[in-house]
């Protein structure tokens, strides 16, 4: 019984650590990733217009932002519970989870940048408005 309580407490603490990112958080993460990855200015302009070329620069930028938002882990892949919390915003969480799970796959080419980008592009294809609306304006 003590083990069960300890495991439950650990899960509760881990779940409590995730905080939905705000617009300000996203801007900070974008700036940090542009700087740390030396993203060229022409790419930054594309990203601002929600244009994401399918190349390593873009893919690693998406992974960097998702890592900072705690939506993706380089080993575990998409963090489904965190994605649901980030994207739900008053919507039915199970419906959001279903949409997220459609885009979760394995790291087939052993490249975390490609893995994060595949999930992003898959979800973006049918849910761009949900992604844009998910960033809290606090």
Swiss-Prot record:
Binding site for (9Z)-hexadecenoate: 30, 61
Chain residues that bind (5Z,8Z,11Z,14Z)-eicosatetraenoate: 30
Principal cellular location given in the protein's record: secreted
Gene Ontology MF terms in the entry: lipid binding; odorant binding
Function according to Swiss-Prot or TrEMBL: Involved in modulation of blood-feeding behavior and capacity in female mosquitoes. Required for normal oviposition. Required for normal fecundity and fertility of female and male mosquitoes. Required for normal expression of VGA1 gene, which encodes the egg yolk protein vitellogenin-A1. Involved in regulation of spermatozoa development. Required for normal female longevity when mosquitoes are maintained on regular sugar meal. Binds long chain fatty acids.
Disulfide bonds: 33-64, 60-113, 103-122
SMART domains per record: PhBP
Assigned keywords, A-Z: Behavior, Disulfide bond, Glycoprotein, Secreted, Signal
Protein name in the entry: Odorant-binding protein 22
Family the entry assigns: Belongs to the PBP/GOBP family.
Residues that coordinate or bind (9Z,12Z)-octadecadienoate: 30, 61
Highest classification ranks of the organism: Eukaryota, Metazoa, Ecdysozoa, Arthropoda, Hexapoda
Glycosylation positions in this chain: 127
One GO BP annotation of this record: sensory perception of smell
GO cellular component: extracellular space
InterPro entries noted in UniProt: PBP/GOBP, PBP_GOBP_sf
Matches recorded under Pfam families: PBP_GOBP
Organism: Aedes aegypti (Yellowfever mosquito)
Residues annotated as signal peptide: 1-16
